[in-house]
Each structure stands twice: as structure tokens, then as C-alpha cells.
Amino acid sequence: EMSASLVGSEMCIRDRYSTPKQYIADYKVNATLEKERYKDGIFGLDVTVGGPADGVASVSYTLNDPLGRPVLSGEMPVKSRGLSNFITFGEQRLKDVKRWSAEHPNLYTLVLELKNAGGQVTEVTGCEVGFRTSEIKDGRFCINGVPVLVKGTNRHEHSQLGRTVSKELMEQDIRLMKLYNINTVRNSHYPTDPYWYRLCDRYGLYMIDEANIESHGMGYGPASLAKDSTWLTAHMDRTHRMYERSKNHPAIVIWSLGNEAGNGINFERTYDWLKSVEKSRPVQYERAEQNYNTDIYCRMYRSVDEIKAYLAQKDIYRPFILCEYVHAMGNSVGGLKEYWDVFENNPMAQGGCVWDWVDQSFREIDSNGRWYWSYGGDYGPKGIPSFGNFCCNGLVSADRVPHPHLLEVKKIYQNIKCTLINKNNLTVRVKNWFDFSNLNEYILHWQVVGDNDKLLAEGNKEVNCAPHATADVTLGKVALPANVREGYLNLSWTRKEALPMVGTDWEVAYDQFVLPGTKGSTAYLPAKAGQTAFTVDKETGALNSLTLDGQELLATPVTLSLFRPATDNDNRDRNGAYPVSYTHLRAHETSAHL
């Protein structure tokens, strides 16, 4: 049902703990920003104290800044009102707060204390706090008032133990995502291990948290569980649990009602409930399409043309963010650039989440002692139906080795993009796609290399360029030697100072441009081999003539003609309902140079 390996395992470790008779049962942190300048923080706190009263107890809190210095505090008595007491600390304003974002995940620390009538501390709890806003503003998805592009992936929990993922493996996941320019993760299709949320808070990943609801086996028509109110309690219970469990995590910027479960009264009610309790995050649901119960149009696997058709509609007010796209199965992700040409040039098209992060396969040993990756069909009696390798559609292998197409994701998702606008003096136009980072946090390394692999020039530059701005950088004229037909300008960017997940030696972005050498004659270059003669176009490298004993053998110049075998995505319909046909395929783009 969830496009994941259907294996059993211990899903999580259960923590057991005891509390005093009177205890802190729940708390909700409200850490947002004022919406005039998005500079000052607004802090509020709601606390629920459970259990029978023990005299006049009190609840106090301290909020410490990222350096550990207290910046806010408060204390209120717990009035005896039965077995549950609700306490609200009034909102307070913090000037020029350190804001949280995926680029700069600044965290404050909240410490909550419950004291008995004698002033003795009986319980201490708390969490990390991030000041940020997440909203739909003028039809665009914004963090801290700034429109952002979702450079995302979907992530199932998978390891060689099944669905149980160790802390070390989660740390490896987030490190790889940060290294490969991913800024968003969708928890597909269920809330995940609590440690994953803490990692995303601390190291900076936007998170789409998703309720554990999927029933696409029932279809989207009249039989859909979404339309049967008998199932409302089940839908509502899973939505409640998702929200209450994770409501205090700043990394969660969008709630998702579920996945591929149809749409109807049950999802309308869960949407209504979430909007009633949640004022600081949008809510999305893919199967709602353009019905009222979604704040984001998040249809999966829409083509570039379908995105353009949506944007051409009148009076649209939802951003288009694909919850799944460019199915990363086998040799794949080749169409990513075409999507991002649209996202970078249309304000209300704001990215999406690749399906998906990790291959759900298992390492096995064959009869010859050699290891291999197993998948559906490798287990159980022969003839048992399976989905084959359909769950091997990750950007990384099951042991977290990056697949080649993760490099394509890194390149397209990179936040620094350059255009060569003057080949004579090597002037480069730099676009800063970061939302909250100046490019002076990075170093530009450049070099000019000839087609003989000799280094002709190199240097480093610091570029001052604000988020979403452009800057023109002139590197200087580099003369190519006469024996060099063409040179290559290589641009590479690294961090000036290391981040916890990204070192100063890691290339975060690169570009390459061809520099023409001295233009030679366009006359044909003749050559002979015995009684055979041929001519080659010096500009294009095309074979224009081939003669044998003076007789021309070519009717036309030879042109490149290539085709590829079918990929996993070409053949991925596992029921054979849509046989692959190649008769419609044509060359997308051709070019030639020598």
C-alpha cells in the first residue's frame, strides 16, 4: 500500500518512565515571528498539568538562547481544578531573534519545571525551540516571510533490520541530504522515529509530517474509505496522534493528511480539525487536488506541461509543490532540469519531493558466497506474487551509497548557479538561490583548463551577493595558447567555515563553460588510408566524405544516431497494463562540436 518493503520488524523502542502524582502532562510551544519585518520573535506557552493537586504547586519555564543565556522566564501557580489544569503563559516579544530555517537552524532551549507546595522541583522537561513562520502568502509557500523552493525527497524508514532505523543511520541520512543540497524531507507515509525530528530541528531540514493513513487499495471512487464516515474515528485518531506527538518541532513546516487514500468527508473533517488547532503551518493533501481541504496543490507525478497548465489557470491561490516526482528507480531522474526550469521561473511553482530516498532491499549471500541485493520475489515459495524491484527506487542504495542520479539531484538543487556572460574577460553572472544566506559565506574557486588538460589560470574569489540576488564577477582575460582548440572554465564553490554536516572541502555547487580557442579554417580536413580517403569537418567533427578508389560511399554526412535500452521506469508497470512503446520517442536535443 505504501510503496515500501512489506517486512516485519520491531518498529521502535518504547521508553518507559514514571512521573510524580502531579506531573506535566503536555505543553505546546508557540514560537513565531511578527509579520511586519519577520525579525522579532513571539513566544507563548501552554502547559497542561495532570494528576491530583498537591497543595499549591507551580510551573515555571526558562528560555535560553542558542548560546545558553536565559532570555525569557515565567512562573504560574497550578490551581486545583480536578485531575487536569491548563496554564497559559502570555505571549512575549523577543527583539531581533535568531530565526530558524533549514539554512540557519538556530535553536533556543526551553526548560520546564514543576514545583510542589514547598518549592521543591518534582519534574523537569523541555525541548528545543525554533522561531520561524510557515505560511501561504500571496499564493506562495513562505518561511519567515520569504518564498522558498522545496528541494525535497521522500523518505521511508529502512535498514537491514527492516523498518527499525538506528540513530547512526538516521545521522547518515541527514548528512547525505545536507551534502547533496536537499532542504526538505517528506515523512512518507507515516510519522517516523522521534530522533529523526530532533536531527531535522538541529541540522536544518524542512519537514512534511504525514499522518499514517493510506488506503489506495480501495480506490478513489465510491468505495474509498475517505467517503465512508464509519472510518472517521480512525482517520481522526491518526491525525490527532501525528499532531500532538510532534507539534513542537520547528522543522515541521507542513502537515500532510495522508497518502493516496481518496478524498471525502473524513479528510474534510481532519483538515478542519487541524486548521482549528494549528495556526502556524499549512496543511496539504494530495488527493484533495483543488478542493478546499488542502492549502497546497501537491499532485504527484505531474508533467512539466501539466504544471504550466495549472499556472495558466485564472485566480489560483495555492502554490504547486509536487509531493512526489521524478521516480528515482534505476537509471532515472534525467528530466529533473526541465522541472527546475519551470520552478525557477514561475513564482507559484515551488519544487517538490523526489520519490524516494533509499532502496528498500536487503543484503543476502548466494550459494557461492557472493552477496547481492534482494527484493520482492527473493523470499517465500516460488510463484508468490511480488512487486519485484519496485521498492528499489532510491537516490541511495540500501547501505546509503549514493546512486549516480543523486549527483544529478545535487547539481539541479544547488543554490549557486552561474552564467558566463562575457567570454573575453570571463565575466560570470552569479545567481544566489539561497533564501537566507549571503554568498560571502562561500568561496568561489575558478580555473581555466585547456583541452590538453593543462592548467592555464586559476584563482579564488569572495562574492558578496544577498539571498535571491545576482552579482557579476569578472575573473579577467585568459589567452588560450595556439595549440588549444578550446578551454574550459571550471567554477567550484565551498563553505568558508564548516557546518556540522558540511565541511570546507565539500563542493556545494559547480559550473563549467567552454571557451573557444583560435578559430581555424572550416575547410574539410582530408586524410588517406590506402585507397580510402575521408574528410572530416573541423568545426563539428562530422565525417563528411568517405571514398574508396575514388567512389563516394556516403549519400550524406554521417550523423550521430544513438538509442538507449529500456530503463526500470520504462518498464515499471508491474501488471503489464501499459506495454512500453518506443515509436513516439524522438531526439530531445542534439549538438556537435570538436
Predicted regions and their residues:
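Secreted/periplasmic carbohydrate-active enzymes, especially glycoside hydrolases
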Residues: S5-E10, D15-L199, Y203-M207, R238, ...
